[in-house]
Amino acid sequence: MLCAVAVFCTSPLFAQSDSLSFRNAQFTSSRVADSWKKFNDTLSKEFKHKNVAYPPKDIYLRAFKSQNEMELWARNNESSEYKLIKTYRICAISGSLGPKRVQGDRQVPEGYYFIEDFNNKSDYYLSLQLNYPNYSDQMQGNQKTGGDIYIHGGCVTVGCMPMTDPGIQEIYTLCLNARLNGQLYIPVHIYPTRMNKSGLSYLNKEYANDATKQQFWSELKAGYEYFEKYHKLLPVMYTPDGKYVE
């Protein structure tokens, strides 16, 4: 038995009304309006250079903790491959490699998430909330898993991913564009490192005696390798006890 992440459709009229309300609420913030004005044209040119439509219809963020990097991928439709648009620098990372399992451990989570909230009144300029804890975190973690994991501005973190204020201005504008263009679920996948030959060698060497982390990383490795080969995402699926599966 497997559990899968499902996306439910709404009527076009409701979706249009909801999108308009969401847009109006977002642009009450001068931070959002200023960010849009500053970065929207630049993003449009970068997408055009990659032959990807803008505003985007489908974007994907992929982060690597060891490298302090977050990649932006995009595609024109569900049948096409994602293209790498650019790579952002994560300003700081707290905790160690491995998933977040308990509240207050200062860990940046690892696994498969999506953006569930746009916070235009953040203490860190702007922020994008992830759906942590997801099903895997809830089943595999402590009863008190914590929450409030964001991609945000600034350069201070106790478990989030700070991108600097200019960085979050651009990323927020990008994600807001995708949301307003119909993408309700923007995937954000977080890995301990690039899971290529050298990355896996490092994990096997440094965490050879940590069977729990090794098992978890083997689950993430399958999704990483599939995307590297096809530039497409697998559906996020779990076993009843919270393990990721293809």
Give the label of every model feature segment.
Residues I190-P192:
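Hydrophobic transmembrane alpha-helices
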Residues M1-S19:
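Bacterial Sec-dependent N-terminal signal peptides
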Residues M163:
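A conserved hydrophobic position in a structured secondary element of the catalytic/binding core
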Residues Q16-V158, P166-I186, M195-E246:
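Cell wall/extracellular polymer interaction/catalysis modules
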